Protein backbone atom coordinates (compact mmCIF):
# COMPACT_ATOMS: atom_id res chain seq x y z
CA UNK A 1 0.00 0.00 0.00
CA UNK A 2 1.30 3.45 -0.90
CA UNK A 3 1.26 6.10 1.83
CA UNK A 4 2.02 9.80 1.66
CA UNK A 5 4.70 11.45 3.77
CA UNK A 6 2.01 13.46 5.54
CA UNK A 7 0.28 10.28 6.70
CA UNK A 8 3.63 8.74 7.63
CA UNK A 9 4.30 11.70 9.91
CA UNK A 10 0.98 11.13 11.69
CA UNK A 11 1.89 7.50 12.34
CA UNK A 12 5.34 8.29 13.75
CA UNK A 13 5.96 8.55 17.50
CA UNK A 14 9.31 10.28 16.91
CA UNK A 15 8.79 14.01 17.46
CA UNK A 16 12.05 14.89 15.68
CA UNK A 17 11.10 12.80 12.65
CA UNK A 18 7.64 14.39 12.56
CA UNK A 19 9.23 17.83 12.51
CA UNK A 20 11.63 16.90 9.72
CA UNK A 21 8.82 15.43 7.59
CA UNK A 22 6.66 18.52 8.09
CA UNK A 23 9.62 20.71 7.08
CA UNK A 24 10.14 18.65 3.94
CA UNK A 25 6.44 18.68 3.03
CA UNK A 26 5.90 22.40 3.49
CA UNK A 27 6.07 24.34 0.21
CA UNK A 28 6.53 21.11 -1.78
CA UNK A 29 3.57 20.37 -4.08
CA UNK A 30 5.37 17.22 -5.24
CA UNK A 31 5.86 15.63 -1.84
CA UNK A 32 2.42 16.71 -0.63
CA UNK A 33 0.88 14.64 -3.44
CA UNK A 34 3.38 11.83 -4.01
CA UNK A 35 2.73 8.58 -2.15
CA UNK A 36 5.43 6.06 -1.27
CA UNK A 37 5.49 2.28 -1.32
CA UNK A 38 7.47 0.59 1.45
CA UNK A 39 9.62 -2.14 -0.08
CA UNK A 40 12.07 -4.79 1.09
CA UNK A 41 15.45 -4.91 -0.64
CA UNK A 42 17.31 -2.36 -2.72
CA UNK A 43 14.81 -1.86 -5.54
CA UNK A 44 11.36 -2.55 -6.91
CA UNK A 45 10.89 -4.80 -9.95
CA UNK A 46 7.48 -4.42 -11.57
CA UNK A 47 5.64 -5.25 -14.79
CA UNK A 48 4.23 -2.47 -16.96
CA UNK A 49 1.58 -3.48 -19.48
CA UNK A 50 2.70 -3.20 -23.09
CA UNK A 51 0.21 -5.11 -25.25
CA UNK A 52 -3.30 -6.16 -24.20
CA UNK A 53 -4.94 -9.43 -25.27
CA UNK A 54 -7.76 -9.17 -27.81
CA UNK A 55 -11.48 -9.80 -27.30
CA UNK A 56 -13.92 -11.02 -29.96
CA UNK A 57 -17.62 -11.50 -30.59
CA UNK A 58 -18.75 -15.12 -30.89
CA UNK A 59 -21.67 -16.94 -32.48
CA UNK A 60 -23.56 -19.56 -30.50
CA UNK A 61 -21.73 -22.92 -30.47
CA UNK A 62 -18.82 -21.46 -32.46
CA UNK A 63 -15.21 -22.28 -31.71
CA UNK A 64 -13.30 -19.73 -29.67
CA UNK A 65 -9.85 -18.82 -30.93
CA UNK A 66 -6.93 -18.29 -28.59
CA UNK A 67 -6.15 -14.67 -27.87
CA UNK A 68 -2.54 -13.49 -28.13
CA UNK A 69 -0.96 -13.42 -24.68
CA UNK A 70 -0.60 -10.00 -23.08
CA UNK A 71 2.86 -8.49 -23.25
CA UNK A 72 4.67 -6.73 -20.41
CA UNK A 73 7.82 -4.72 -19.92
CA UNK A 74 9.68 -5.75 -16.77
CA UNK A 75 11.34 -2.76 -15.16
CA UNK A 76 13.37 -2.18 -12.02
CA UNK A 77 13.51 1.03 -10.00
CA UNK A 78 16.65 0.89 -7.85
CA UNK A 79 16.80 2.79 -4.59
CA UNK A 80 19.14 5.77 -4.38
CA UNK A 81 20.50 7.39 -1.23
CA UNK A 82 19.90 11.07 -0.56
CA UNK A 83 20.77 12.74 2.71
CA UNK A 84 23.16 14.91 4.67
CA UNK A 85 24.71 15.30 8.10
CA UNK A 86 23.55 18.08 10.41
CA UNK A 87 26.57 18.90 12.57
CA UNK A 88 26.24 21.24 15.55
CA UNK A 89 29.18 22.61 17.51
CA UNK A 90 28.46 22.05 21.18
CA UNK A 91 29.90 25.43 22.20
CA UNK A 92 27.59 27.26 19.80
CA UNK A 93 24.61 25.17 20.82
CA UNK A 94 25.20 25.88 24.51
CA UNK A 95 26.08 29.56 24.30
CA UNK A 96 23.86 30.79 21.46
CA UNK A 97 20.62 28.90 22.01
CA UNK A 98 19.17 31.61 24.24
CA UNK A 99 17.84 33.31 21.09
CA UNK A 100 17.10 30.30 18.90
CA UNK A 101 17.43 26.54 19.22
CA UNK A 102 20.58 26.20 17.11
CA UNK A 103 20.39 22.43 16.73
CA UNK A 104 16.74 22.55 15.62
CA UNK A 105 17.54 25.31 13.12
CA UNK A 106 20.43 23.38 11.57
CA UNK A 107 18.37 20.17 11.33
CA UNK A 108 15.54 22.14 9.69
CA UNK A 109 17.88 23.66 7.11
CA UNK A 110 19.40 20.24 6.37
CA UNK A 111 15.91 18.79 5.89
CA UNK A 112 15.14 21.58 3.41
CA UNK A 113 18.33 20.77 1.52
CA UNK A 114 17.24 17.12 1.25
CA UNK A 115 13.84 18.25 -0.03
CA UNK A 116 15.40 20.55 -2.61
CA UNK A 117 17.66 17.79 -3.89
CA UNK A 118 14.76 15.33 -4.16
CA UNK A 119 12.56 17.84 -6.00
CA UNK A 120 15.33 18.62 -8.48
CA UNK A 121 16.01 14.95 -9.23
CA UNK A 122 12.27 14.22 -9.40
CA UNK A 123 12.47 16.17 -12.67
CA UNK A 124 16.07 15.83 -13.86
CA UNK A 125 17.39 12.70 -12.15
CA UNK A 126 19.56 10.39 -14.27
CA UNK A 127 20.90 7.12 -12.89
CA UNK A 128 23.56 6.74 -15.58
CA UNK A 129 27.15 7.92 -15.36
CA UNK A 130 27.72 7.18 -11.68
CA UNK A 131 25.49 9.98 -10.40
CA UNK A 132 23.98 7.81 -7.61
CA UNK A 133 20.56 9.26 -8.51
CA UNK A 134 17.25 7.75 -9.56
CA UNK A 135 15.70 8.50 -12.96
CA UNK A 136 13.45 11.56 -12.95
CA UNK A 137 10.39 12.44 -15.03
CA UNK A 138 12.37 13.92 -17.91
CA UNK A 139 14.13 10.60 -18.48
CA UNK A 140 11.19 8.31 -17.65
CA UNK A 141 8.89 10.06 -20.12
CA UNK A 142 11.78 10.75 -22.55
CA UNK A 143 11.28 14.27 -23.80
CA UNK A 144 13.91 13.86 -26.51
CA UNK A 145 11.70 11.95 -28.96
CA UNK A 146 8.11 11.59 -30.15
CA UNK A 147 5.72 9.63 -27.99
CA UNK A 148 2.03 9.34 -27.18
CA UNK A 149 2.59 11.02 -23.81
CA UNK A 150 4.64 13.93 -25.13
CA UNK A 151 2.88 17.05 -26.42
CA UNK A 152 5.16 19.50 -28.18
CA UNK A 153 4.78 23.16 -29.07
CA UNK A 154 6.80 22.30 -32.19
CA UNK A 155 10.03 23.48 -33.78
CA UNK A 156 12.19 25.27 -31.26
CA UNK A 157 9.22 26.02 -29.02
CA UNK A 158 6.31 28.46 -29.08
CA UNK A 159 4.15 30.56 -26.79
CA UNK A 160 2.05 28.41 -24.46
CA UNK A 161 -1.66 28.15 -25.28
CA UNK A 162 -4.59 26.77 -23.28
CA UNK A 163 -5.40 24.46 -26.19
CA UNK A 164 -2.01 22.77 -25.81
CA UNK A 165 -2.46 22.57 -22.04
CA UNK A 166 -5.82 20.85 -22.60
CA UNK A 167 -4.11 18.47 -25.03
CA UNK A 168 -1.60 17.62 -22.31
CA UNK A 169 -4.39 16.86 -19.83
CA UNK A 170 -6.02 14.54 -22.37
CA UNK A 171 -2.86 12.42 -22.62
CA UNK A 172 -3.54 11.17 -19.08
CA UNK A 173 -6.01 8.28 -19.02
CA UNK A 174 -8.07 6.81 -16.21
CA UNK A 175 -9.24 10.14 -14.82
CA UNK A 176 -7.90 13.64 -14.54
CA UNK A 177 -4.32 14.30 -13.47
CA UNK A 178 -3.76 14.86 -9.76
CA UNK A 179 -1.30 17.67 -10.47
CA UNK A 180 -0.08 19.99 -13.21
CA UNK A 181 3.57 20.61 -12.38
CA UNK A 182 5.24 23.65 -13.95
CA UNK A 183 7.69 26.48 -13.43
CA UNK A 184 6.71 29.86 -12.02
CA UNK A 185 6.95 31.43 -15.47
CA UNK A 186 4.57 28.84 -16.92
CA UNK A 187 2.14 29.36 -14.04
CA UNK A 188 2.13 33.11 -14.71
CA UNK A 189 1.43 32.44 -18.39
CA UNK A 190 -1.46 30.09 -17.61
CA UNK A 191 -2.94 32.68 -15.24
CA UNK A 192 -2.64 35.40 -17.89
CA UNK A 193 -4.24 33.21 -20.56
CA UNK A 194 -7.17 32.31 -18.31
CA UNK A 195 -7.75 35.96 -17.41
CA UNK A 196 -7.57 36.97 -21.07
CA UNK A 197 -10.29 34.43 -21.86
CA UNK A 198 -12.63 36.13 -19.39
CA UNK A 199 -12.47 33.31 -16.84
CA UNK A 200 -10.72 33.17 -13.49
CA UNK A 201 -8.46 30.76 -11.64
CA UNK A 202 -10.15 28.87 -8.82
CA UNK A 203 -8.11 28.75 -5.61
CA UNK A 204 -8.26 26.29 -2.72
CA UNK A 205 -6.48 26.21 0.65
CA UNK A 206 -4.01 23.39 1.17
CA UNK A 207 -3.25 21.26 4.21
CA UNK A 208 -0.45 23.60 5.32
CA UNK A 209 -2.47 26.80 4.91
CA UNK A 210 -1.06 27.65 1.49
CA UNK A 211 -3.29 28.50 -1.46
CA UNK A 212 -3.26 26.38 -4.60
CA UNK A 213 -4.60 27.50 -7.97
CA UNK A 214 -6.66 25.09 -10.07
CA UNK A 215 -6.89 24.80 -13.83
CA UNK A 216 -9.89 22.80 -15.06
CA UNK A 217 -10.26 21.54 -11.50
CA UNK A 218 -6.65 20.27 -11.41
CA UNK A 219 -4.19 21.66 -8.83
CA UNK A 220 -1.24 23.58 -10.25
CA UNK A 221 2.04 22.76 -8.53
CA UNK A 222 4.86 25.26 -8.93
CA UNK A 223 8.36 23.81 -8.95
CA UNK A 224 11.36 26.08 -8.53
CA UNK A 225 13.47 23.34 -10.09
CA UNK A 226 11.83 23.21 -13.52
CA UNK A 227 14.07 25.29 -15.75
CA UNK A 228 12.91 27.81 -18.35
CA UNK A 229 16.05 27.21 -20.42
CA UNK A 230 15.24 23.92 -22.15
CA UNK A 231 16.34 23.77 -25.80
CA UNK A 232 14.37 22.12 -28.63
CA UNK A 233 15.25 21.09 -32.15
CA UNK A 234 12.65 19.64 -34.48
CA UNK A 235 10.03 19.81 -31.75
CA UNK A 236 11.87 17.72 -29.14
CA UNK A 237 14.31 18.51 -26.37
CA UNK A 238 18.04 18.45 -26.94
CA UNK A 239 19.08 19.85 -23.56
CA UNK A 240 18.03 21.77 -20.48
CA UNK A 241 20.24 24.82 -20.95
CA UNK A 242 20.81 27.40 -23.65
CA UNK A 243 17.17 27.66 -24.71
CA UNK A 244 14.05 29.58 -23.68
CA UNK A 245 11.55 26.76 -23.23
CA UNK A 246 10.04 24.96 -20.28
CA UNK A 247 8.17 21.71 -19.64
CA UNK A 248 4.82 21.11 -17.94
CA UNK A 249 3.95 17.73 -16.46
CA UNK A 250 0.49 16.22 -15.92
CA UNK A 251 0.67 13.50 -13.27
CA UNK A 252 -1.48 10.96 -11.52
CA UNK A 253 -0.06 9.62 -8.27
CA UNK A 254 -0.31 6.30 -6.45
CA UNK A 255 0.12 2.61 -7.15
CA UNK A 256 -0.51 2.06 -10.84
CA UNK A 257 0.61 5.61 -11.66
CA UNK A 258 3.59 7.70 -10.51
CA UNK A 259 4.77 6.73 -7.02
CA UNK A 260 7.81 6.74 -4.83
CA UNK A 261 9.39 3.66 -3.31
CA UNK A 262 11.42 3.59 -0.12
CA UNK A 263 13.00 1.18 2.31
CA UNK A 264 12.60 2.45 5.86
CA UNK A 265 11.10 5.78 4.88
CA UNK A 266 12.70 9.09 5.71
CA UNK A 267 15.10 8.49 8.60
CA UNK A 268 16.54 10.84 11.19
CA UNK A 269 19.48 9.19 12.92
CA UNK A 270 21.08 10.77 16.02
CA UNK A 271 24.72 9.83 15.39
CA UNK A 272 25.87 11.57 18.56
CA UNK A 273 29.25 12.96 19.56
CA UNK A 274 31.86 13.30 16.83
CA UNK A 275 35.33 11.91 17.36
CA UNK A 276 37.99 14.60 17.46
CA UNK A 277 35.50 17.49 17.50
CA UNK A 278 33.34 19.05 20.18
CA UNK A 279 30.26 18.58 18.03
CA UNK A 280 27.22 16.36 17.73
CA UNK A 281 25.80 14.95 14.52
CA UNK A 282 22.31 14.11 13.30
CA UNK A 283 22.02 12.32 9.97
CA UNK A 284 19.00 12.71 7.68
CA UNK A 285 18.85 9.97 5.07
CA UNK A 286 16.37 8.56 2.61
CA UNK A 287 16.61 5.39 0.54
CA UNK A 288 14.21 6.37 -2.22
CA UNK A 289 13.37 6.07 -5.91
CA UNK A 290 10.68 7.02 -8.40
CA UNK A 291 8.40 4.38 -9.95
CA UNK A 292 6.59 4.88 -13.28
CA UNK A 293 3.94 2.15 -13.21
CA UNK A 294 1.87 3.18 -16.24
CA UNK A 295 2.76 5.39 -19.21
CA UNK A 296 -0.83 6.55 -19.65
CA UNK A 297 -0.93 8.05 -16.16
CA UNK A 298 1.52 10.85 -16.92
CA UNK A 299 2.35 13.20 -19.75
CA UNK A 300 4.56 16.16 -20.60
CA UNK A 301 4.17 19.35 -22.63
CA UNK A 302 7.50 20.61 -23.98
CA UNK A 303 8.61 23.77 -25.74
CA UNK A 304 6.42 26.11 -23.66
CA UNK A 305 7.53 29.72 -23.96
CA UNK A 306 6.23 32.92 -22.39
Model-derived features with residue positions:
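Short alpha-helical segments and helix-capping/turn motifs at coil-helix boundaries
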Residues: 28-32, 165, 266-267
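Extended, compositionally biased alpha-helical segments that mediate assembly or anchoring
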Residues: 2-18, 225, 232-306
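Alpha-helical scaffold segments that mediate packing/assembly in large oligomeric complexes
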Residues: 88-171, 216, 224-226, 301-306
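Short glycine-rich, low-complexity/disordered patches
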Residues: 34, 120, 126, 203-207
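Hydrophobic alpha-helical segments involved in membrane association or supramolecular assembly
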Residues: 46-48, 108, 112, 183, ...
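Assembly/oligomerization interface modules of large self-assembling protein complexes
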Residues: 2-87, 107, 130-131
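Extended oligomerization regions of viral-like shell subunits
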Residues: 40-48, 52, 159-260
Amino acid sequence: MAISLAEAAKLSNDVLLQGVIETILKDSPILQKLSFIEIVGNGLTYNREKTLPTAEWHAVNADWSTSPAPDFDQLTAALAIVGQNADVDNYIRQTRSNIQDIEAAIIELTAKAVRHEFEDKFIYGDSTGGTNQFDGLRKLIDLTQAGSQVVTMGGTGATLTLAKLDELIDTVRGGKPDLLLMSRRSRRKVTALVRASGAYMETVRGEFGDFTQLYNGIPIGVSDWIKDTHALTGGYETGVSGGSCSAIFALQFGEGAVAGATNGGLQVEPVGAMEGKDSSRTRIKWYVTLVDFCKQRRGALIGAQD
